[in-house]
Amino acid sequence: MSRTRIVIGISTAVGVAAALGVMAAPTAGAQAHGHDGRFTVVADHLNNPRGLSPAPGGGLYLAEAGRGGKPCVSGGPEGETCAGLSGSFDLITKGGHVKRIITGLISASGPGGVAAIGPVSVSRGPRGTFYGLFGLNTHVIPPKGAIPDNVRTKALAQLGRLWLVKPGAWVKTVSNVGDQDWAWTKRHSDLGPTDWPDANPNAVLFSHGSRYVADAGANALVRVKWNGNARVLHYLAMPANFEGDSVATCVARGPDGALYVGELLGGFYSPEHARIWRVTAHHATVWAGGLTTVQGCGFGSDGAFYATEFQTDGLTAQNPAGDVVRISQNGERTRLGVGKLFQPSGFAAGPDGSIYVSNCSIAPATGMGPQLCPTGGQVVRLG
C-alpha cells in the first residue's frame, strides 16, 4: 500500500476517536511490561512534527511536515488534498525554543492540516550541518493548473529530495532519492505490491560517512552515494499470506555497527506484526518481531534499542494511543509513555540517558480537538 494513503488515511480514524473520546491506554503485549518514567513536553504547538536528530549544544533538529495549505483539490485519500508551503526544518534549543531554520517548504495534508506530508526526517551531519529529507516523489504531483504554480514549482523541487543544510541555512540538493526509488520499484514490480511503482522516503541517517534512507513506499533500505545515486541495499520482503506492505519507516546504527530498519506493518494491519531488520554488508535478518506500527527507532546511550509505536492497537484501530518499546541488550522489553503518547513518530537519544519523541505527530499546531492533542504536535522527553 502507498505510504501516502496509509498516513493520511489514519486521520479518518483519528477524527472518529476524538469524537468518541477514545483515549484508552494501549493494550500491552505479554512480552513487555510498562514503566511510567518522567514525561516532559519540550515543545508544542508544532505542525505535524516527524523526524528528530540530536543537534550541537544539546538541542534537537526537527522536521515539521507542515499543515498543508489552500486550495484543496480533489483526489486525495480523504477526497481532498490541501497543498501549501507550511513545512519547515527546525532547531529546538536545549531550553525548548523552536527556531525554524528553513520555512516555506512543501506540505500536503488532508482538510484541517491533519496528517501532512512534506519534510519528514533529519539527521545530524558533519561540521554543523544536517540532512533534511522530504517524503513522496514527483510522480504524485498534480498537473499544471490543479494547484498554484508556486506550490507546484516547490513540489517539483522538493518532494522526494534529500538536502544537506549548512550553517546559515545554505541548502544543497544531494539526491532525488524518491524519484530514483520510484524508478527502481517500476523495474522490480514483480517484487512488490500491486500499487507499485511507488516511493516515499521516510527516514534519513548519516552514519560512518554514509547516507541511508528508509523508503516506506519502496519497502527498502537505500544508500545514497556521494554522486547522488540511490542504491537499494535491502528490500524488506513481505511474509507469506501478507495483507499489506512491510513499509520501511526508520533506520539506525547499532553499537555492533549493523544497521537496524523498522517497519510500520510487517505485511499485516493487525497488531504485533512489525519487524526490526538487522542489515550488514552481507545479509539481512529479522532481529526482532512482535511490534506494532513502528515509526521511529534508534539506540540509547545505554545500548538499548527503542522503537516508537504509532498506534499500539494497530493502524486501523480507532484508539490513537501509542508508546515507545525499549528492548534491552538481554532482550527484555519495556513500554514507555503508556497513556501519554498519541501517534508518536520520530526518535532521538540524548547523551544523558533521556529519549526524545515527536508526539501527536499528525496534528497541526492547533490540535485535533479538545480531547486529542489540544496543543498540537509536540516533542517530549522521556526519562
Predicted regions located by residue number:
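Secretory targeting and sorting signals
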Residues: 1-31
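Extracellular beta-propeller repeat domains
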Residues: 29-383
